[in-house]
């Protein structure tokens, strides 16, 4: 006797190339990045956002300037400023917003990530 078992299929994950804007890079963030690039005196720089293991919640965000673009990088442009995200990091950042905020407590780049299940108190690490 043969028994067939039907397993539910996993929901399909959208391919970032099929999304109009897989990540939101705000005007405020672009303006600050432009300012920082001008200080570095290198027009070829782009802001790379990435995810790495670490922090109190398991993953943490990283930011760095980069002149190199990989063929599979997501390249977003806002107001002439380029944001780069590698495919591995992008899977954790789909739908997120990269912003820059200034307040009485200081100024910083902020990632609002709808995929993060928990975040630490400082907001720089998260878990999925």
Curated annotation (Swiss-Prot):
Disulfide bonds: none annotated. GO terms for molecular function: 2 iron, 2 sulfur cluster binding; 4 iron, 4 sulfur cluster binding; iron ion binding. The keyword Disulfide bond does not apply. PROSITE patterns: HESB. Its cofactor is iron-sulfur cluster. Binds 1 iron-sulfur cluster per subunit. Iron-sulfur cluster binds at residues 56, 120, 122. InterPro entries: FeS_biogenesis, FeS_cluster_insertion, FeS_cluster_insertion_CS, FeS_cluster_insertion_RrpA, HesB-like_dom_sf. Keywords: Iron, Iron-sulfur, Metal-binding. Homodimer. This is Iron-sulfur cluster insertion protein ErpA. It comes from Xylella fastidiosa (strain M12).
């Amino acid at each position: 006797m043969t028994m067939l078992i039907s397993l539910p299929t996993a929901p399909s994950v959208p391919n970032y190339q099929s999304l109009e804007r897989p990540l939101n890079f705000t005007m405020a963030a672009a303006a600050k990045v432009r300012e920082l690039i001008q200080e570095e005196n290198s027009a070829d720089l782009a802001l790379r956002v990435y995810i790495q293991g670490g922090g109190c919640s398991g993953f943490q965000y990283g930011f760095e300037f980069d002149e190199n673009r990989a063929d599979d990088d997501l390249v977003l442009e806002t107001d002439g400023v380029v944001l780069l995200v590698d495919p591995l990091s992008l899977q954790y950042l789909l739908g997120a917003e990269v912003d820059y905020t200034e307040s009485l407590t200081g100024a910083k780049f902020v990632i609002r990530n709808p995929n993060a299940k928990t975040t630490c108190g400082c907001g720089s690490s998260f878990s999925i």
